[in-house]
Amino acid sequence: MKSVGLITEYNPFHNGHLFHATLSKQRSETNVTIAIMSGNFVMRGEPAIYHKFKRTEMALSAVDLVVELPLIGSLSSSDTFAEIAIKTAQYLDIDIISFGSESASLKDLQYLATQMIDYEKHPDFKEKLKQGKSYPRILSELTHNDTLLQSPNNILGISYLKAMQQFAPHMSALTIKREGSLHHQKVIDHHHFASGTSIRRSLMNDNVDWKNVVPNQIQSLYCKPHTTVEDTFPFIKHQLITQPKESLHSIYTINEGFENRLQTMIHRSDSFESLLSNLNTKRYTQTYIQRVLMNVLLNITKDDVNKEINAVRVLGMSEKGRSYLKYLKANYPNRHYITNVNQKTAHYFKNEIKATHVYNLLSNQSQTDFNTPLVRI
Amino acid sequence: MKSVGLITEYNPFHNGHLFHATLSKQRSETNVTIAIMSGNFVMRGEPAIYHKFKRTEMALSAVDLVVELPLIGSLSSSDTFAEIAIKTAQYLDIDIISFGSESASLKDLQYLATQMIDYEKHPDFKEKLKQGKSYPRILSELTHNDTLLQSPNNILGISYLKAMQQFAPHMSALTIKREGSLHHQKVIDHHHFASGTSIRRSLMNDNVDWKNVVPNQIQSLYCKPHTTVEDTFPFIKHQLITQPKESLHSIYTINEGFENRLQTMIHRSDSFESLLSNLNTKRYTQTYIQRVLMNVLLNITKDDVNKEINAVRVLGMSEKGRSYLKYLKANYPNRHYITNVNQKTAHYFKNEIKATHVYNLLSNQSQTDFNTPLVRI
């Protein structure tokens, strides 16, 4: 069975995702479509607007199998996000990764990926890192401001391609053009497509524009967001007040004394938004800061980080997904494809289970990894 | 200057406290009255209904000097509470401790205190502790159910007397009769006196009964409680979900694997009240459990515990209190009587400062140890 993998967040699922999934199937000429989806927290450094179980249901309108991207992936910068996603794809024996990019030229992106693997070995690169420059800035300096590197989906695509070269050399890639300008748009101004940001805003504000830009047959799944990032603030404040510096220092992604800045700024902040603006410096991107705060919220320490895949959490599947899972289990009897979490399998997913408990605390939801059955359609 | 010390919580201050302070002054024939008062968290294992600054203002209607009982004292069982309170009194050169008791016979209580110091050295005592019996139960067995030990203020008084024998042999004691039956009454049914419980309830429910039982001249200080113990629940739940077992194990007062019970029961609980009832066993008293939960909330670890007094935090004073402080500073130039907390003195009060920050998070108050001047009348 030939399979195509999509690395996704579906926060929430919309027509752009449907379009990408449909084209990916056609162009890859594969039988099975697999989404590797972020769980309850997303790469922007926020809780997802709906929990992963609902987002799985949405996803199954377009794909055959939904597995959870390990939490560490979702709360890392693009290279680690890509590494963990590609290793997950490898574990699932995926043949082709299909990703959206502004460029849509696989050749150009491949060329940059190869170049960047070289750049990163260069002494200049390490020197600039030491000087406190951000990773995207260094790359754009080293590549003489290559315009390809000014588009977020190109950057992520290049990270996938780098990870594939390093960790999954037999996997192939496919890229589908997406409109960069859409990505950060604040309001819905297109008849069929809109950015995640504008859709989340529409759902939050109870305005019905979102109805035009999500697939008809799953509209009943959409409701007011389960939670927003502001709900995290009291808990983050509590952590920053009560944890000693050494504990904060051990939190994943905190480095260079950022814990000091956190403990100073928390006393001047009375909302997530004000904390972000107090923490803002040239040195760090907003998403870096948000991911740090989510790692604080979830108490993810450097010791909790494992970039290897020892098991994959299956969140949902269609009939075709079920056949594919059978095929995987037959071919890789020593791998762990887990469709239900229980006392025996929970140890593989400690971070994800914790994230679900915290998500429920934020959102007053009650579906846990233990009490929620595999989603099937 | 001869001084009398009152070990108090004033949660909130009421006529019973005024009565006790007045009689203490008369009977001790002293010039200065000093309250050693719990800060923002009280021995019942709860946040106080008003922050310590407001409670200091209330207290100064009856006493000359208000100092803060170190947080560790407030969140410990009666022996450690008493030890830290008596050591604080010693640091303040207090001559006489005056406490309320149901018995009112200093001789009887002294006799029991001496007996109990002996009992605690007895192998039987340690054996019973190992069997998992609670401290009050063992004592009542060893003293053949002495009726004196069935009244909470007698027990606390005996703890003071024991601590004085051990740590402040030159300090003397005075006890004033209080009506035991009042202590836990739920409603106000007396014209002038009522229990703290019934007064807190009246304030919470916006019923005006409390007005009859607090001193007239300070009634304007009373308002709806700043917070209740239920406000702590989301934060405690968050801690119990996100902290690994080893971290919980290091929390002060947690022992014998109580961390396991906490992590199991938190998932079955959706309020502080339900958590308490889920945690309830014969082995532990409710106040023990509540104090454990406050130590979790404040992240007070075993390493944060210091039973020695290296400085005393002065919260408020009258003119007479000011003279006494002058006298202390002249006589003990190496001791630290701190009237304002700043970067230089903050290290003495790490636990108390943290408790204030958490109290403010719970209650939406904004008076910190740094921005609140000494209360003076």
From Swiss-Prot, chains A, B:
EC number: 6.3.4.-
Catalytic activity: cytidine(34) in elongator tRNA(Met) + acetate + ATP = N(4)-acetylcytidine(34) in elongator tRNA(Met) + AMP + diphosphate
One GO CC term, this protein: cytoplasm
Organism superkingdom: Bacteria
Gene Ontology MF, one: ligase activity, forming carbon-nitrogen bonds
Annotated ATP binding sites: 7-20, 100, 153, 178
Keywords: ATP-binding, Cytoplasm, Ligase, Nucleotide-binding, RNA-binding, tRNA processing, tRNA-binding
Subcellular location: Cytoplasm
Gene3D superfamilies assigned to the protein according to its UniProt record, in alphabetical order: HUPs
Root EC class: ligase
InterPro entries: Rossmann-like_a/b/a_fold, tRNA(Met)_cyd_acetate_ligase
Pfam family, one: HIGH_NTase1
GO aspect biological process, one term: tRNA modification
Matching PANTHER family: TRNA(MET) CYTIDINE ACETATE LIGASE
Primary role: Catalyzes the formation of N(4)-acetylcytidine (ac(4)C) at the wobble position of elongator tRNA(Met), using acetate and ATP as substrates. First activates an acetate ion to form acetyladenylate (Ac-AMP) and then transfers the acetyl group to tRNA to form ac(4)C34.
Family: Belongs to the TmcAL family.
NCBIfam families, alphabetized: PRK13670.1 (NF010191)
Protein's name according to its UniProt entry: tRNA(Met) cytidine acetate ligase
Gene: tmcAL
